[in-house]
Amino acid sequence: MAKSHQARKTYRPLIALAAVLALGLVVRVVFLVQLERSELGDVLSLDSRLYYDVAHAISTGGALPPGALSFNPLYPVFLAATFRLFGEGLVAPRIVQLAAGLLTIVLIYLAGLRLVEGPRKGKLSGEATAIIAAATAVLYAQFVLYEGMILASAFEVLFLTASFVLALALDDELAGERPVRLGPRRVPPWGSGLLLGALCGAGALGRPNLFFLLIASLPVWLYLRNRKRRRAHVPALSFLVGAAIVLAPPVAYDAARTGRLVPITTHGGINFYVGNGPGSTGVFLPPADVRSGTSAFLEDARAKAEAETGRGMTEPEVSSYYVHKALSYIGANPGAWLALLGRKLLLFFGQDVSDMPSAFLYERSCSVLRLLLVPFAVIAPLGLCGLVVLFRSGRNRSVVSVFLACALASVLLFYVNVRYRLPAVPVLILTASLAVAWGAREISRKRFTRVAGLAAAAIAIFFLVSHRTFVPVSHSASYAFLGNYYLEHKDQARAADAFAEAYRLDPNRAEAIINYARILREQGRLREAADLYARAYAESPRFPLLAIEYGMVLSHIGRGNEARRLFLEATSASEARERALACRLLAQEALAEGNRGEALLWVKRALENVPGDPQLTAMLKQLESSR
């Protein structure tokens, strides 16, 4: 009987885990089917398109973009591997990512078992915490959504959770409680440290700002945790070796391309500036004359830096320029920056700041997402209360503190959105589950006062951070994203509707104004388009191609002198193609006035910007032959 009772106790949590995983599998299969049937199934965000194009180049033996890496390499490498194995479709990577999501749930369960001591008399049950955490992870819609996107988010969450589980296990090992085992064999601390470093190194290839903080913090934690033992430095050193092995290839690649040390990618500087420079609100809001798409964002940021410095710059120099510019602003405005950090902190634990993809769009065609009913607004307050329970227990405080502090700092140093916050969610789910398990135990003991205090704290935190709007959440960018997708697929009518809705939702955003003006121009409503272009130009005169587009509309409605002035301004644009186009339009204006000599000069100047352009070359020959 005793053995039978013990067997039931052993298998009961495993049966519960199997049920949770079965539910997670069903949810993911339904989501994949709905996504593939949806018109959004083939839609790639700007980041996704960049990764797809890079992966295509890798898988077909093509060349990578020149210079240092301007993208995080983890996901393009994974995508290229799936392209090689299964062809260039989106189903295969999505299946792998959804499987990674199920593995993450298992790891969250294992972390829950490690997080608390039980089951022993007077102690919380680790099994209860683990099952609650796994079930919560299944019911969190953002995990499922991002597992279906062509982005690295699923792997970032996986590597963070795996690192957290291994750090908890290593903490138990160093405390002399439970050794780390691989099957029947014990894994020495140096081996665990090596694997932990490799996991963090792999994570840094997808989310450098988070995992580099862990790579800097965990060796210190390992040394301090082990300092009273002989060879206390061994786990910390093995961690650094593991991280270095994984990070060496991209760092060497960047060094060979630039002649200097670059930590994986070169776009950190502009992101740091956007999150901390003048006008920052704590969310992604690029400067008025910088477009928001990944490639365009980096191109415009570089052009802006070169215009402000008056010299050409490499990618690492551009990144350094924006870091120093942001630090100068912070140094001159320390009070404003501290207030901004406080705002970001509340945003981190509060409202969902949408990124692309947006759950708002996908819930319409993937109804299973609406059935996943545990929002971050519930997880965050309970997670913070769970931290109090954890700290009072005295277990694993340092591990949880390191991981949560690094996850928090990685966002606060830049800006807040759902995708950047996502790797922190497993840790908060675990502490939230700990709070729920603790509350259930206290209720069973009739200690209602303690539970009431915890519940009151959770409600207070909810109303402090989750029930307030710190930044207006607009879906304008989502509709602009859809509009560009429809344009790419030659669906002008739906693109027009999407851009009109984007403008209606945010009539003061430069990109929304310009996109809607383009639709009005295509519809022949030139005077209305001119009015919108005028608004956009007054706000962002250096926005790429804006002066040219505005000038073309003015030319068509008979305001040639104003158009010519705009074209002249565009001849000093940062991009050679834009300068060449402005020169060509000035040549056409000169021809319309019968001034062939001036037209010839403008065509020659255009060719100085784009030597060998076939259309301009033909235009030059025609003008020279008719002289």
Which residues fall in each region the model found?
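Multi-pass, polyprenyl lipid-linked donor-dependent membrane glycosyltransferases
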Residues: 70, 74, 93-100, 132-170, ...
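Membrane-interface transmembrane helices that cradle and orient dolichyl/undecaprenyl
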Residues: 3-5, 120-124, 163-195, 221-225, ...
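Membrane-proximal stem/loop segments at transmembrane-domain junctions that anchor or position
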Residues: 263-347
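Membrane-interface anchor segments at the N-terminal boundary of transmembrane helices
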Residues: 92, 322, 328-329, 336-400
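Transmembrane-helix signature of polytopic, membrane-embedded enzymes
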Residues: 108-139, 157-158, 180-185, 394-402
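Transmembrane-helix motifs of polytopic, lipid-linked glycan transferases
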Residues: 95-120, 162, 166, 381-385
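Loop-to-helix entry region of an early transmembrane alpha helix in multi-pass inner-membrane enzymes
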Residues: 73-77, 87-106, 131-134, 146, ...
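Extracytoplasmic catalytic/substrate-binding loops of multi-pass membrane glycan-assembly enzymes
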Residues: 35-52, 64-81, 87-91, 261-265, ...
